[in-house]
Amino acid sequence: RRLAAASPNPQQGLDFFAIRDNTLNAFALPGGYIGVHTGLILAAESESELASVLGHEIAHVTQRHIAQLVGKQSQAGMVMLASVLVAILAARSNSQVAEAALAAGQAGALQSQLSFSRDMEHEADRVGLQTLEGAGFDVRGMPSFFERLQRAGRLYESNAPVYVRTHPLTTARIADMDNRVAQMRYRQV
């Protein structure tokens, strides 16, 4: 309740539920539903660490990231449709140009969606941290939990290049949150 009340939209209805699953995961769904895997709950070493994850997911809801993502997917669909039309027209004279147009359309649409997803994750981190602070939790819980995720190696980190990831690198997220936390006055309610 403290987190919801401190969120950018305290009137937003939120329903939390747990999923019996050992993985470290949480997610937000349309309508304000937020799911948390029991593995993540058990991995949190403090109330503030768990609250940091919930604040992040609340931010996805209050910032309307899901609706924005749906809109972005529609936009990507239009880009794909345009590339298909160009490919059809080009196929009459040169099949290689048609293939290139199709591949470029697919790559452009995918890259746009991945970049947008990373931007939403950064925003959810920032808004979630503000929510955490407003609710009186220890803001150090967010970078602390990110560090644990990084050590566990179970989320976010892989050998995939940054440009194909949906989430920012955990090291970058830790540095960003550490910098933001350093600028905040510590208070815990």
Tell me the role of every PLM-derived stretch:
Residues 48, 58-75, 93:
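Catalytic Zn2+-binding segment of zinc metalloproteases
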Residues 77-93, 100-110:
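Membrane-active amphipathic alpha-helices enriched in small hydrophobic residues
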Residues 16, 108-189:
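Extracytoplasmic and endomembrane cell-envelope/extracellular-matrix remodeling and assembly machinery
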Residues 35-52, 114-119:
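Short pre-active-site segment immediately N-terminal to the catalytic Zn-binding motif
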Residues 70-78, 97-100, 136-146:
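Acidic/histidine metal-binding catalytic segments
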Residues 36, 52-60, 64-65, 124:
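Active-site recognition of the HExxH zinc-binding catalytic motif
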Residues 1-9, 43:
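A metal-dependent hydrolase signature that marks the N-terminal structural subdomain at the beginning
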Residues 18-32:
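Catalytic zinc-binding patch centered on the HExxH motif and its immediate surroundings
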